[in-house]
Amino acid sequence: KEGYIVDYHTGCKYTCAKLGDNDYCVRECRLRYYQSAHGYCYAFACWCTHLYEAAVVWPLPNKRCK
């Protein structure tokens, strides 16, 4: 599974400025999911790959970014 990291409180994606390989996104994906996850900056938000199927990613059901 893959997808954007989402903030559970706001419903917003984790933003990033440096597109492509991005240490911040790798770190956040691994903290949020697990150590074998990978991340990069895509469309100015952190995109995570190699996630488990039950991982919660953006968009959250019934919660819009404010």
UniProtKB/Swiss-Prot annotation:
| Location of the LCN-type CS-alpha/beta domain | 1-66
Give the primary localization class.
secreted
What tissue specificity does the UniProt entry give?
A: Expressed by the venom gland.
So which domain of life are we looking at?
Answer: Eukaryota
Q: Which InterPro entries match?
A: LCN-type_CS_alpha_beta_dom (IPR044062), Scorpion_toxin-like (IPR003614), Scorpion_toxin-like_sf (IPR036574), Scorpion_toxinL (IPR018218), Scorpion_toxinL/defensin (IPR002061)
Coiled-coil ranges (or none): none
Query: One Pfam family name from the record?
Result: Toxin_3
List of residues that carry Lysine amide: 66
The record's Gene3D superfamilies line, in alphabetical order, gives: Knottin, scorpion toxin-like
UniProt keyword annotations, A-Z:
Amidation, Disulfide bond, Ion channel impairing toxin, Neurotoxin, Secreted, Toxin, Voltage-gated sodium channel impairing toxin
Keyword Disulfide bond (UniProt): yes
Tell where it localizes.
Secreted
Q: Which cysteines in this chain are paired by disulphide bridges?
A: 12-65, 16-41, 25-46, 29-48
Q: What is known of its domains?
A: Has the structural arrangement of an alpha-helix connected to antiparallel beta-sheets by disulfide bonds (CS-alpha/beta).
Q: What does this protein do?
A: Beta toxins bind voltage independently at site-4 of sodium channels (Nav) and shift the activation voltage toward more negative potentials, thereby affecting sodium channel activation CC and promoting spontaneous and repetitive firing.
What protein family does this chain belong to? Belongs to the long (4 C-C) scorpion toxin superfamily. Sodium channel inhibitor family. Beta subfamily.
Q: What is this protein called?
A: Beta-toxin ChFII.9
Which source organism? Answer: Centruroides hirsutipalpus
